[in-house]
Swiss-Prot record:
It comes from the Bacteria. This is Tryptophan synthase beta chain. The beta subunit is responsible for the synthesis of L-tryptophan from indole and L-serine. The gene is trpB. Disulfide bonds: none annotated.
Amino acid sequence: MTQQLHSYFGEFGGMYVPQILIPALIQLEKEFIEAMKDISFQTTFKNLLHHYAGRPTPLTLCQNLTSGTCSKLYLKREDLLHGGSHKTNQVLGQALLAKRMHKKEIIAETGAGQHGVAVSIASSLLKLKCRIYMGYKDMKRQELNVLRMKLMGTQVIPVHHGSATLKDACNEAIREWSSTYKHTHYMIGTVAGPHPFPTIVKEFQRIIGSETYNQIQTHEKKLPDAVIACIGGGSNAIGIFSGFIDIPSVQLLGVEAGGLGLHTEYHGSSLQCGETGIYFGMKSPILQSQEGQIKNSYSIAAGLDFPSVGPEHAYLKKINRVKYVSINDEEAINAFQELSLYEGIIPALESAHALAHALKIIRKTPKKKQILIVNLSGRGDKDIITVNNALLNKEICK
């Protein structure tokens, strides 16, 4: 068997995995190509998105946040999708692929728990066994999502070594897949990892961009000035960017985790501070030491706490199609509070990074007429305790 799809985005991407996994990845690519041509598969997938997951999701105009400015700020409401985030889109597609390949079990990793919940949902629905690897630190800060996964029959496996976060959970999931690939499907949660995962996940998240393109035309009869999304691995961003990538007049902005500041060791901004290397089965920017060791990333948002990024984002940065910036923890928390207070919408901390940058733009040029769209990739129920603790600690330190 040989590859049929391009496995690189410029110099980034590839299939850097143990030789034993190459046939499994090529089989996955083959099944994906055939599924994309299969009307029955496509119909089943679209029906699940509509009747089960709740698509299309709304494009909501903020009523109060932009008061006193000439800007319009729209939110693409992936937080309203079944499961609470954009993750549900692509796990339904991958679960259908797993069934098509006659796989009986699903393994995956999760950081914020949103991907883990989504995988649990799809596995429960399609009667697949499910095991999720999750860093012990992430399990502690995302206890609600851990309970959700267990309620749906998922075995959640804590990862204690290393930084005990998403990076280490990814390593453990790939390690298990290397010995169980004949009967398991590894369900990567983002547009990272070895080929063909970045392409598959993008295809199943493309619905966000196509819906948003049509909705903004209906609302405004024109295109937005900018589309903004947070970047961890980068699937929600690739999803919404795909609807506008070929329109140069629409600025695309990816927002990384600034953590405690890019001048510190505590951030997750691999596109701005990383060096190209091999990690998680791909060639992409990585936070690494001078000796080539993978550094620990950091973000108050568990889903952005990842030391690398999807290879297509690296390519889009290199060709200057997308501008990548960072938002620190404090700015994200402020945006989290503002959206909750003024619009009655509690965003995921990950999404709050994108919102914070949008508010920066609006407040820097309050008299400018502009239309901005933020991908509200998930809801923030999971983050309320984290934010409350951060605010309490801030008060104590005053």
